[in-house]
Amino acid sequence: MPDTVGEHPALFVTLTAPSFGVVHTRRAGPDGKPRRCRPRRDARVCEHGVPLSCALVHDEDDSQLGQPICAECFDHRGAVMWNNALSELWRRTTIYLPRAIARRVGMTHRRLRELVRVSYMKVAEYQRRGLVHLHVVIRLDRAMPSYRAAEVKAPPAGFGVEVLEDAVRAAAGEVSVRLPATLGDFTVRWGGEVDVRHIEAHERRRVAGYLAKYATKSTELAGGVLHRVAAHQVDGLPVTEHVRAYLWEAFALAADPALAERRFGGYAHALGYRGHCLTKSRRYSTTFRALREAREEHVHQELLARSTDADRRALAGAIERVASFRFVGLGHLTAADALLAASAAARAREQRCAAREALLLEA
């Protein structure tokens, strides 16, 4: 990527989920100090008789953070469906965004595609409440002809960062996904908190650090699990009741044959989310293939420089490198080899048992 890409109009956008219930939170006041969680002047309670206030100032590692104040009021089913439809919501956002840009500069969508190209990289991050947020770097590039598609140039004049910001906010407010009637005629939208920040050239490295931090988070932040689970394992998992409710709702939705293609059960451990942690548009930056090829060439040159054998150096320096595998066999070649292996394994087991017994006698 050219160094001039840092001068293109670019935004760091955070797209959040809507509220599915009141949860314990940690907020900072104008002075930067943490504030009380959910202070209320009245003694209001929910329909289940649970007080809707919390006067505590939670620590950053407080296990209550992200937990619903009333578990019965929290819409776990809606949250699972929202996570499940998030990838489709983002796909439609990428369709709405160029249209919103075209409206703001007063031209048709077709003409816009001849002038600019929207590039992005997004990272999915789990929040403590179990919902997935997206952190996205969105950049405007000049649209290039097909024979120069790999080139990245600055967009024409008139396509500044202010135009891009207005379009992002408009697209986020307009886009929606209507789910099938089998899910209760549920409509998926972005939450009201859309954070948009301008990225200056000197901030590129800092934003990359943010994205790397978000990419390392997983469902563990919400108290979830990293592996797939079956319905009969849910009750025995070491998770919070909040996460357990997510899992049960996912498996309840998976039981409906009409929803089989949405794979709620297969992604129950991900709280319904089916997308990737990190994705990008084709021309945003280099490709994984290019990185693999560069890494392969680097390792090849390192091995070539370290080798002292003339034949190996000649083979490694060949223009064409061919590697092949041939199936030799499975298991032991003879019955005697199998007997020796079984005897060695039996002796190892006996020695471990004897060592454990010796430790018990010493205790």
Positions of predicted regions on the chain:
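A solvent-exposed, charged loop/short amphipathic helix patch at secondary-structure junctions
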Residues: V23-M81, A154
